[in-house]
Amino acid sequence: MLAYLRKGETYADLAGGFGIGLATVFRYVREALDVLAAMASSLTTAVGIARRKAFVIVDGTLLRTDRVGMTGGRDRPFYSGKHKRHGVNVQVLADPAGRLIWTSPALPGARHDMGAAREHGLLDALEKAGVRVIADSAYRSASANVEVPHRRPPRDPDTGERRRRLSANEKAVNSAHARLRGPGERANAQLKS
């Protein structure tokens, strides 16, 4: 099981390496994944844990997958145009130290982070619980409890010129925001390593 999870070995490689049948490998992997899934905390439990923290970090990550050979473009939902890879979108909830609190069920990789968080009810549950959320700019306009970095205003539609640069104060706020959000990337790294 560890060889499957850690190295991504195929069932055929596992069967050959351990000298067991392919059906046995399939059964062992399914049983182990079912046990791990049963041990995972629910969103309700995760929000209860988050309520006891000063803030939580929400971030989405793309877990790469092999391209599935589907005809007729049925694999398109799994292709992330942002990352130029096939994968699944997983929402991650982490504490201020970067420890994993909760991960969402996987959605197709083409799904935007905020759309995925809304589909799982993550943002609504955190807002209802009054939890302060630190997130990246993908979660802009999510809700009042979600803090995102300032962004430079868009171009003026009439002249095409940038309206203004970020002020020194806005840059300082963005820098502090990035320091708070940084440990959340560690939680994402735990999923990928």
Residue ranges and their predicted role:
Residues 13, 17-27, 34-37, 41-193:
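Short, well-ordered secondary-structure "scaffold" segments embedded in the functional core
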Residues 1-7:
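Short, amphipathic alpha-helical "recognition" segments used to contact nucleic acids or chromatin
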